[in-house]
């Protein structure tokens, strides 16, 4: 985990309170933290916290990440949840329910390489 990561920068109690407040106010949305993998050569993302519609697919969210980092179409990007590549067609709500952290946020990491050796799902 990076030194400037959201988890290291904010105590657990604060993160839990924030995610609880967000989920109560926006029940149809998923609180997501997106951070670049440590050694990746892709650009840094301009913001880490996202409030994503629950019915958005992983593939649609990857598109959002690509736009935020201004990555050209010729470059690949991989988004990981707990070091695995989630299925592109999976809904963010399903991935959130299965992989949310104890603090109530879903943590995702992006990279220009398939750094964790995960398999692809189409």
UniProtKB/Swiss-Prot annotation:
Annotated Gene Ontology cellular components are: autophagosome; autophagosome membrane; cytoplasmic vesicle; microtubule
Q: What is its main location?
A: membrane
User: Which InterPro entries does this UniProt record tie to the protein?
Assistant: Atg8-like, Ubiquitin-like_domsf
What are the residue ranges of the propeptide?
A: 118-122
Q: Tell me if Cytoplasm is a UniProt keyword of this record.
A: yes
Q: SUPFAM superfamilies, per this entry?
A: Ubiquitin-like
**Post-translational modification summary for this protein:** The C-terminal 5 residues are removed by ATG4 to expose Gly-117 at the C-terminus. This Gly-117 forms then a thioester bond with the 'Cys-558' of ATG7 (E1-like activating enzyme) before being transferred to the 'Cys-258' of ATG3 (the specific E2 conjugating enzyme), in order to be finally amidated with phosphatidylethanolamine. This lipid modification anchors ATG8 to autophagosomes.
Which UniProt keywords are present, listed alphabetically? Answer: Autophagy, Cytoplasm, Cytoplasmic vesicle, Cytoskeleton, Lipoprotein, Membrane, Microtubule, Protein transport, Transport, Ubl conjugation pathway, Vacuole
Instruction: State its location(s).
Output: Cytoplasmic vesicle, Autophagosome membrane; Vacuole membrane; Cytoplasm, Cytoskeleton
Q: Which GO terms describe its biological process?
A: autophagy; protein transport
The site feature described as Cleavage is recorded at 117-118
The keyword Cell membrane is assigned to this record: no
**Covalent lipid adducts (Phosphatidylethanolamine amidated glycine), residues:** 117
What is the reported tissue distribution?
Constitutively expressed.
Describe its membrane topology: Lipid-anchor
Q: Which domain of life does the protein's organism represent? A: Eukaryota
Job of this protein = Ubiquitin-like modifier involved in autophagosomes formation. May mediate the delivery of the autophagosomes to the vacuole via the microtubule cytoskeleton.
Q: Which family does it belong to?
A: Belongs to the ATG8 family.
Q: How does it assemble?
A: Interacts with ATG4. Interacts with NBR1.
Q: What is this protein called?
A: Autophagy-related protein 8b
Tell me the organism: Arabidopsis thaliana
Gene encoding this polypeptide? ATG8B
């Amino acid at each position: 985990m990076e030194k400037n990561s959201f988890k290291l920068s904010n105590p657990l109690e604060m993160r839990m309170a924030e995610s609880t407040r967000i989920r109560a106010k926006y029940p149809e949305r998923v609180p997501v933290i997106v951070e670049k993998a440590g050694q990746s050569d892709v650009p840094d993302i301009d913001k880490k916290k996202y409030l994503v519609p629950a019915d958005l697919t992983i593939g649609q969210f990857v598109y959002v990440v690509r736009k935020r980092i201004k990555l050209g179409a010729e470059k690949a990007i991989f988004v990981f949840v707990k070091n695995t590549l989630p299925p592109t067609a999976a809904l963010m709500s399903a991935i959130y329910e299965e992989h949310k952290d104890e603090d109530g946020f879903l943590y995702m990491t992006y990279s220009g390489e398939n750094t964790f050796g995960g398999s692809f799902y189409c």
